[in-house]
């Protein structure tokens, strides 16, 4: 599908989509502040005489009967989120709590005025509302689900209860590259390992202090970029400490690394108590180790650096049992890619991230983030991390579970969606999956028998003031969505 003339002349069927998006842009909708936009959607449905339900966290479900002659077609759920990430340039005076978001069109693109635009996922929501108004649109029984707080934890999707929304097929409109179809996402959980923090006075003869920092790593998102096999600062530092231990007597005084559960740690720091006569030799060993690790990670992390500094001699250090459990656990724990998908090329199926190591008052806590698009593999790796803790005699707790959206290869929905797309467009459909959590994964938990797929218009630089949406792709995706609704069997 190709477009000629000025951009707005080519926006024919999606003209109403852009009008609704502009209306939505007048209403503040930062994550956690969605009542206004939720009420707008409720009133939109009421004005059309449709059945509408709003829950306590402002999720909205709208129900529309099938078009005449389509009563026996599969029931369809359209789904998108109504909150947005609110970020602005440093010199912008924009107040997201009250100021409208600008819709500026330049060439084939729409952007805001030095703020995020909110096309993620406002454009998908606008498409859903435009469809409600279109009495010429043919479709089976249809429900529209608008969720809240997607950007800060998917709270809206978490809150959806069994029976709140039902359908044979679910079309999520939150994929951000035209012609891409997402068919699977990872589920996940956290394992919190808690090592008793036993301290003791520094031993006689340990009269010098050293700080070792592993830094200069790229880090990155522990789902999207785990396939890069980048260095994990927590594990690199642990490997370094273990090797020093094998040659010199040391006491560990502190260890910390990582800041977020979903980020590959890019920095970790340990402070040691050592004998002054060993300092020079330990520094020589560290210089050698640095070169070894720089070689190991020369492609993934060329900036890897060890920073070694003299520090005051620690007066209090970890007891030997604490040090032993900490180093052994992190050294032996799986980190990075555990397995890859056999169904989708280049997709990481299961991974592990030793995300954070930090001291609490009575424990050293290791936070591990595990992801998988296969529930059985997720269970295996989670139990493996728990059993390792048990073998070392330390506590481990599993928290924060969310389900995977497992790939349903050859599903009737995927087959029809891809076939129609390839009939309509010169560019072939790109079927992919993501090694991160999506709302579809959570919704699959309450809709286990619903077939799902995700697509949407091209959005560049979401979550930044440079966010922009490609208007020809809005037209294309909307035309495709209308055709798909009419054709689904």
Predicted regions and their residues:
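Acidic/His- and Gly-rich active-site-bordering loop/insert found
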Residues: 9-109
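Active-site metal-coordination/substrate-binding segment of hydrolases
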Residues: 70-152, 157-168, 331-335, 340-341, ...
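Acidic, glycine-rich active-site loops and adjacent beta-strand->loop/helix elements
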Residues: 82-84, 145-153, 175-178, 218, ...
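Midchain, well-structured core segments that form catalytic/ion-binding scaffolds
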Residues: 108-111, 151-152, 158-371
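Active-site-adjacent substrate-binding region
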Residues: 225-227, 232-255, 395, 407-450
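Substrate-recognition/cap regions that form aromatic- and gly/pro-loop-enriched pockets
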Residues: 347-436
């Amino acid at each position: 599908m190709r477009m000629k003339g000025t951009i707005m002349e080519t926006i024919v069927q999606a003209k109403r989509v852009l009008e609704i998006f502009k209306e939505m842009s007048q209403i503040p909708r930062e994550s956690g502040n969605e009542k206004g936009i939720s009420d707008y959607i409720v009133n939109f449905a009421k004005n059309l005489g449709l059945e509408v339900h709003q829950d306590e966290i402002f999720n909205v479900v709208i129900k529309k009967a099938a078009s005449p002659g389509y009563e026996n077609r599969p029931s369809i759920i359209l789904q998108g989120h109504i909150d947005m990430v609110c970020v602005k340039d440093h010199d912008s005076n924009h107040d997201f709590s009250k100021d409208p978001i600008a819709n500026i069109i330049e060439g084939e693109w729409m952007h805001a005025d030095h703020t995020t635009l909110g096309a993620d996922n406002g454009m998908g929501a606008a498409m859903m509302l435009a469809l409600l108004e279109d009495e010429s649109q043919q479709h089976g029984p249809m429900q529209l689900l608008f969720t809240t707080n997607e950007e800060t934890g998917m709270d809206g999707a978490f809150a959806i209860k069994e029976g709140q929304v039902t359908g044979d097929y679910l079309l999520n409109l939150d994929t951000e590259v035209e012609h891409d179809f997402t068919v699977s996402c990872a589920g996940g959980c956290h394992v919190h390992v808690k090592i008793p923090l036993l301290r003791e006075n520094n031993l006689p003869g340990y009269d010098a202090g050293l700080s070792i920092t592993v830094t200069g790593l790229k880090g990155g998102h522990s789902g999207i970029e785990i396939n890069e096999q980048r260095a994990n600062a927590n594990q690199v530092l642990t490997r370094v400490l273990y090797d020093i231990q094998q040659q010199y007597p040391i006491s560990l005084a502190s260890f910390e690394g990582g800041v977020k559960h979903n980020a590959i740690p890019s920095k970790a720091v340990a402070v040691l108590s050592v004998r002054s006569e060993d300092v020079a030799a330990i520094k020589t060993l560290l210089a050698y180790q640095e070169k070894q690790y720089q070689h190991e990670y020369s492609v993934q992390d060329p900036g890897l650096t060890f920073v070694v500094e003299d520090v005051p001699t620690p007066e209090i250090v970890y007891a030997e049992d604490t040090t032993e459990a900490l180093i052994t656990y992190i050294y032996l724990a799986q980190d990075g890619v555990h397995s890859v998908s056999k169904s989708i090329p280049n997709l990481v199926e299961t991974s592990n991230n030793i995300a954070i190591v930090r001291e609490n008052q009575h424990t050293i806590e290791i936070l591990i983030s595990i992801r998988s698009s296969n529930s059985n593999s997720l269970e295996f790796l989670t139990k493996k991390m728990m059993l390792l803790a048990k073998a070392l005699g330390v506590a481990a707790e599993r928290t924060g579970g969310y389900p995977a959206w497992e790939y349903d290869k050859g599903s009737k929905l995927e087959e029809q969606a891809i076939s129609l797309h390839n009939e309509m467009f010169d560019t072939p459909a790109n079927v992919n999956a993501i090694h991160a959590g999506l709302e579809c994964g959570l919704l699959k938990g309450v809709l286990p028998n619903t077939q799902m797929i995700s697509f949407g218009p091209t959005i560049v630089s979401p979550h930044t003031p440079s966010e922009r949406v490609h208007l020809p792709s809005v037209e294309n995706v909307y035309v495709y969505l209308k055709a798909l609704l009419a054709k689904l069997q």
